């Protein structure tokens, strides 16, 4: 996806980018590639691929979520900042919190955020399991996102405790196997959520499958969740 395709594909969805925003994406790309030589941030480094598989792919969440109605966003395990920072560039009013367990990645994100002059961004070096038990952040976010390979049952335990009542957890997945959704239903219910919709589509250019699962937080998460670090992965709420 070249820059022109990036601009026109987003414009078709009602997202028009200013010169300033395009400069921010360009700098994001350059810093990602530069820092990637020092640490493992991504295996995708070709410019056209970064714009499609990282930037555009992250922004697809805005095709199904009205970000004008979102103020606070928490991104769990965002790695190199996906999906939250491309979304933040498009919607500057957002207050974004990123939680990541690797300090090196947090250092990259802080440096990147300063270079892009992003306001209202905070980066927390913590495990999602511990962060989700913090009284000052638990059940406080309008939207919680995760673009990760972990199973839906595991992601739900890490993310739903952070969403406020009537807030949303959005899981961005490459492919949504029906069995993963079925296996995740119990966790979603136990944690106070309800599957609202699964949006399935293909990325332009390469036509690869993408799914965005929208889970609405309908009631408070029981206090014991998330369980201690490592437990959600070892024994997910399934069955």
UniProtKB/Swiss-Prot annotation:
Q: Does the keyword ATP-binding apply?
A: no
Q: Which residues bind S-adenosyl-L-methionine?
A: 77, 82, 128-129, 147
State the EC number(s): 2.1.1.-
List where in the cell it is found.
Cytoplasm
State where composition is biased (Basic residues): 216-227
Q: What is this protein called?
A: Ribosomal RNA small subunit methyltransferase G
Which GO terms of the molecular function aspect are on file? rRNA (guanine-N7-)-methyltransferase activity
Query: Would the keyword Ion transport be found if you checked this record's keyword annotation?
Result: no
**Quick one: where's region Disordered?**
215-239
One Gene Ontology cellular component annotation? cytosol
The record ties this protein, via Pfam families, to: GidB
Q: Give the family this protein belongs to, as stated in its UniProt record.
A: Belongs to the methyltransferase superfamily. RNA methyltransferase RsmG family.
Which InterPro entries does the annotation name?
rRNA_ssu_MeTfrase_G, SAM-dependent_MTases_sf
Q: Sorted alphabetically, which keywords does the UniProt record give? A: Cytoplasm, Methyltransferase, rRNA processing, S-adenosyl-L-methionine, Transferase
The role this protein plays is: Specifically methylates the N7 position of guanine in position 535 of 16S rRNA.
Q: Which domain of life is it from?
A: Bacteria
